[in-house]
Amino acid sequence: MNLVGENLSYKLTEELQLRKISFNFEKGKLYTILGRTLSGKTTLLKTIAGLLMPDSGSIRFEDKNFLEIPVWKRNIAMVYQQFINYPHLNVFENIAFPLKQRGLDPQKINDEVFKSLKLVGLEGYEKRKIQELSGGQQQRVSVARSLVKNAKILLLDEPLVNLDYKLREQLREEFKNIFVNGLSEESIVIFSTTDPREAMELNGEVIVLDEGRVLQVGAAKEIFENPKDLKVAAISNDPPMNILKVDIDSNKIKFEDIEIDIPDHLSKLKDKHFNFGIRASDIELNSNGFEFEVELAEISGSETLLHLTRGNAKIITSIEEVMDFKIRDKVKINFKSNKAYAFDEIGNLVSSPFGGTNV
């Protein structure tokens, strides 16, 4: 049976953290809850785990009322943002702890721990003290301890958020393999994150959450290609998708003093005023382009993010190399208009380069 939630609501003081959330999580699948900070991700995971009791709604699993099952009987493993390990135990002992609590045979414990160590890339570290490990290695220990429990539900609450950029990239690539190969077909994996790149890398089903509400549910590729509205477009892109208020006139897209040829997929729009959306990666430096002024330059890993202005227009472009720019430098850019999106004045998707619409 699936893990099914219906109309879950939870209020903290006077603020609603969850607003009638429903879900249907199938066994053997990986799900990503994508949302900004304070969107309700942690609250939802804690509600599933039994650490919080919803004010209304229901959760059923294997045809049982999950809310009536005590926390210790729910067969759930949870990995937190912080590296939660037992400092007085070595790596092997940390991972073996839940198995020893269950009184398993020592040989069985040994086999399961070494299987888990191999899966998370910590072979040879079994005798190390926790204090001797890097942040990434400590989080791998937390994941390994969760895997050996062979829990039916594995919850991961932003497990990469406290790691440095390079380590996040490395673990992001490894985690999908860990979850796909490390769990049985009877398990459900629910991974929460603020980072759309993690959601795309894991490539499971994505639930976009904002202010305690589910905005959109779908395959990672579908969410990325066809965000249903401006909120989803902002949450599912990093940096957020650029949005410009534009007009259409004489087959041109116009804003400020800029005119762009209208691409085929936007040529039949009935409304002459709309929100023009374009990703930072679809704006390129071009010596024959439109001149903008640098407001801020950021280095993000191996990329350079340029915050640019022209009149009242503000945009961000990403360059796939580290470059040196100063504030008020002039740069010229082109928009890849064939990659552009159109959202109506209330924010719904009208047209995407992938054929999607929400009107």
Predicted regions and their residues:
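A short, flexible loop at the N-terminus of ABC-type nucleotide-binding domains that lies
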Residues: M1-G5, S9-K20, E68-P70
